[in-house]
A protein has these predicted regions:
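S-adenosyl-L-methionine-dependent DNA methyltransferase catalytic core
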Residues: 1-89, 224-228, 253-371
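Core alpha/beta nucleotide-donor-binding catalytic domains of modification enzymes
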Residues: 9-199, 209-215, 219
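Class I S-adenosyl-L-methionine
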Residues: 127-142, 152, 156-348
Length: 371
């Protein structure tokens, strides 16, 4: 029986074409105009290049095997790639101290016609201090606050100084050893102060898995977050989520803190969330969709590096500069940076900005990671 040919919409019918040159895909985002009715307003802290923001907003492409619910799909782009629907979330404020992070964020989010003025190139400490001096820094009527507060001081790949970080809130090395709330390791406290100010219905904070094994750091952070706005937030037990269990071909694990405003909850939800064991129908943590290490055969298979990289031509055959540029350092033997290839048939390692992973090593330029 001949294989059925799927007819995808011709790109000529779209007025706002966006290209993804690595995969020879062309698509548009449909109607980019904001629908204010029913919109959930998001204040983003430590925004970086926008990973958490984009995850909430939707409207991006991903591999077909990563999507387990057809209702999430706006349009099938080809046999392997889909464009996801936009969600109800809208980013109304973002910030970071790195100019290159802001540039990347604006470069991508501009396709959603986001006002570039909402991204503030400032430290969260300085923003809170300006608010305390009477400036109207933060927006009103915020529904969700998100933030991946700096992880270097909690990571097993770093010096693990935790709260005693030797780096300031602006990313600069400190010359003194005096206790301070303005170090990189204590910036979650300033996130808590933003929550005090804007009083969102919910907040989501993220950090590396290594935080869980660093003494009682996890419990301290959970308790501090719980005290926001006069103890008005239920902060659920933080959970470590593995990206491979959600259709991402990467061995990335992150601890997630979720806080929900008590006064925003209905009575039955408040009662359920205050239980030691939260009923599944009220638990906000996502259930795994793919079986990387949960051992549930009813779930979808893990998405592999082959799935997402298999369509790419070899670097020497590519016309895309971001793919052609990679480290050509001399082979120095096993165990050194960049000498081990990723597992093509499995999940890739977490890639740090130093061009290598926490466990495995991979010689690639940062440009290539933008795929």
């Amino acid at each position: 029986m001949a294989k059925k040919t799927i007819q995808y919409p011709p790109i000529e019918q779209y007025s706002d074409i966006v290209a993804e040159p690595q995969y020879d895909l062309f698509y548009n985002n449909g109607n980019n105009e904001r629908d204010e009715e029913g919109t959930l307003r998001v204040l983003s802290l430590f925004s970086g290049c926008g990973g958490m923001d984009l995850g909430l907003e939707g409207g991006f492409i991903c591999h077909r095997h990563s999507v387990t619910n057809d209702d999430w799909i706006e349009r099938q782009l080809n046999d392997n790639w889909t464009l996801l629907k936009r969600n109800r979330f809208r980013t109304i404020f973002a910030c970071d101290i790195l100019e290159e992070a802001r540039n990347s964020w604006l470069d991508y989010m501009s396709r959603f016609r986001v006002n570039p003025d909402i991204y503030h190139l400032e430290s969260i400490v300085d923003l809170v201090k300006m608010q305390e001096k009477g400036l109207d820094v933060f927006p009103h009527h915020v529904d969700v606050v998100t933030g991946g507060f700096p992880c270097q001081d909690f990571s097993v790949a770093g010096k693990r100084k935790g709260f005693d970080s030797g780096v300031s809130h602006k990313g600069e090395k400190r010359d003194d050893n005096l206790p301070s709330e303005e170090t990189r390791g204590k910036l979650y406290v300033w996130m808590k102060q933003v929550i005090d100010i804007v009083q969102p219905k919910m907040f989501i904070a993220e950090n590396v898995k290594g935080l869980v094994s660093l003494g009682d750091v996890k419990e301290i952070i959970q308790k501090d977050f719980s005290s926001a706005h006069g103890n008005d937030y239920i902060v659920l037990d933080p959970q470590v989520l593995h990206a491979g269990n959600y259709g991402v071909p990467e061995t990335r694990e992150r601890v997630i803190f979720i806080g929900i405003k008590r006064s925003a909850l209905k009575a039955d939800a408040l009662h359920a969330l205050e239980q030691n064991k939260v009923p599944s129908e009220y638990n906000p943590y996502p259930k795994p969709t793919h079986d990387f290490n949960v051992h549930d055969q009813s779930l979808s298979r893990p998405v592999t590096c082959k799935d997402v990289l298999g369509d790419l031509p070899e670097p020497e055959d590519s016309h895309d500069l971001s793919q052609k540029t990679y480290s050509k350092a001399k082979y120095m033997g096993n165990g050194t940076q960049g000498q081990t290839e990723i597992n093509y048939w499995g999940l890739g390692p977490t890639i740090r900005s130093e061009h290598h992973g926490n466990i495995e090593y991979r010689r690639l330029s940062l440009l290539k990671f933008r795929i």
